[in-house]
């Protein structure tokens, strides 16, 4: 599925295995396991849900439209675009930008679509407004032959679904939105999109076994969490995902929410950023190499690219070179890794055997566990987001003026 290499995080000389062992990670481990065992947080329980038959009525539609914000949609996008980067029957409406939303609705035949309305609270402003845009268009049809599915626990959207007898799936109350990709939030639309959701859960379960290991060097979620925690304490509080697989771009968006919203509490927090190699070597690498030394880089690489071929070309000295196309980006990644390490920039590497359902299930679950461990290290609640509530109240007030 995947492997984790932390050698360069130590090689730059700012932290050592001794420093890692000085961190009270055993307490962080036991505290998180207690919360998972007692159901205080439920993101582990949901990966063992065997009842996937409930999604069987959700396929057979030409288009899949998903409406949601943040944790209600980013995990689905991360997995779908990683696994199916060249398919175009998915439409994700994840903003209140009129140009984006209305351009999608202009080209989608709703009669040939299954439409997901996803909001745990049922009151998310953007999701509510975008649902009403859909509703207006459906009401103008002579008959609606598509399907509306609501994934919500309450609020205005649940009342709408019940009033109109639409299908409703719920989300476990102990699973925050940004941890909900392995619930109906992610599994239902992914099933409609033809993704093998059983393999996603299988990958998450395999990673869960690994994350049960109390030996930190054999537990990538715990080890990566401790390494980032230590570097944060040393002033490196910007965590950059640098993916050399472009289809993982949306994983980076999911990662930004997971890290930012979970750990940005009580004056703590790591700032998550996303770079795509090799193209960002021509924009951001100068900053990473020669700018402020306040970053730790996580390289994302694949052992195998799904599309590849033999190529021949001439270099700048007219010398012929023969190689696989993928050898180019592999060499660029390795060169960047070596150069950053030589310049004292700590980095780790996650290698996915192949970009498939199992690997993505494992990857997302590893990061959920990592954030759970880091919440314990910082002694914060990684599962709420109290600071954003103020903006929501102000926004509703402005809209009603």
From Swiss-Prot:
GO biological process, one term: glycolytic process
Field pH dependence: Optimum pH is 6.3. 50% remaining activity is observed at pH 5.3 and pH 7.
Active site: 261, 282, 392
Transcription keyword on record: no
Enzyme Commission number, as recorded: 5.3.1.9
GO molecular function annotation: carbohydrate derivative binding; glucose-6-phosphate isomerase activity; monosaccharide binding
SUPFAM superfamilies on file: SIS domain
A single GO cellular-component term on record: cytosol
The reaction(s) this protein catalyses: alpha-D-glucose 6-phosphate = beta-D-fructose 6-phosphate
Keywords attached to this entry: Cytoplasm, Gluconeogenesis, Glycolysis, Isomerase
Disulfides per UniProt: none
Compartments where found: Cytoplasm
InterPro entries: G6P_Isomerase, GPI, Phosphoglucose_isomerase_CS, SIS_dom_sf, SIS_PGI_1, SIS_PGI_2
Activity regulation statement: Competively inhibited by 6-phosphogluconate and erythrose 4-phosphate.
Biophysicochemical property: temperature dependence: Optimum temperature is 89 degrees Celsius. It does not lose activity upon incubation at 80 degrees Celsius for about 120 minutes and still has a half-life at 95 degrees Celsius of 40 minutes. At 100 degrees Celsius, an almost complete loss of activity is observed after 30 min.
Pathway it works in: Carbohydrate biosynthesis; gluconeogenesis; Carbohydrate degradation; glycolysis; D-glyceraldehyde 3-phosphate and glycerone phosphate from D-glucose: step 2/4
Subunit structure: Homodimer.
Function: Catalyzes the isomerization of glucose-6-P to fructose-6-P.
Entry's family note: Belongs to the GPI family.
Protein name, entry field: Glucose-6-phosphate isomerase
Gene that encodes it: pgi
């Amino acid at each position: 599925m995947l492997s984790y290499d932390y050698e360069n995080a130590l090689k730059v000389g700012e932290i050592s295995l001794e420093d890692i062992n000085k961190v009270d990670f055993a307490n962080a481990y036991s505290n998180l396991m207690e919360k998972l065992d007692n159901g205080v947080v439920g993101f582990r329980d949901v990966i063992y849900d065997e009842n996937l038959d409930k999604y069987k009525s959700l396929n057979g539609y030409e288009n899949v439209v998903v409406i949601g914000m943040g944790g209600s949609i980013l995990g689905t996008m991360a997995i779908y675009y990683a696994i199916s980067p060249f398919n175009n029957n998915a439409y994700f409406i994840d903003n209140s930008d009129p140009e984006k939303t209305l351009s999608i609705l202009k080209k989608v035949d709703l009669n040939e679509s299954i439409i997901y309305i996803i909001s745990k609270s049922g009151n998310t402003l953007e999701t509510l407004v975008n649902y009403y845009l859909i509703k207006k268009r459906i009401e103008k049809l002579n008959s609606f032959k598509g399907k509306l599915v609501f994934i919500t626990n309450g609020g205005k959207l649940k009342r709408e679904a019940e009033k109109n007898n639409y299908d409703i799936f719920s989300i476990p109350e102990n699973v925050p939105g940004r941890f909900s990709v392995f619930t109906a939030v992610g599994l239902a639309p992914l099933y409609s999109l033809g993704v093998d959701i059983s393999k996603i859960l299988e990958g998450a379960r395999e990673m869960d076994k690994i994350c049960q290991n109390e030996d930190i060097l054999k537990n990538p979620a715990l080890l990566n969490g401790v390494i980032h925690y230590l570097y944060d304490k040393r002033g490196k509080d910007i965590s950059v995902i640098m993916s050399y697989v472009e289809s993982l771009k949306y994983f980076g968006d999911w990662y930004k929410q997971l890290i930012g919203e979970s750990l940005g509490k009580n004056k703590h927090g790591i700032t998550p950023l996303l770079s795509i190699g090799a193209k960002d070597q021509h924009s951001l690498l100068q900053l990473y190499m020669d700018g402020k030394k306040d970053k730790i880089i996580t390289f994302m690489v694949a052992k195998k690219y799904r599309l590849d071929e033999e190529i021949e070309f001439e270099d700048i000295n007219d010398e012929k070179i023969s190689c696989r196309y993928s050898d180019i980006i592999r060499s660029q990644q390795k060169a960047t890794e070596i150069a950053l390490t030589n310049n004292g920039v700590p980095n780790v590497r996650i290698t996915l055997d192949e970009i498939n359902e199992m690997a993505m299930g494992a990857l997302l679950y590893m990061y959920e566990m990592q954030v759970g461990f880091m919440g314990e290290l910082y002694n914060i609640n990684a599962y709420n987001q109290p600071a954003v509530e103020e903006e929501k109240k102000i926004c509703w007030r402005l809209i009603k003026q």
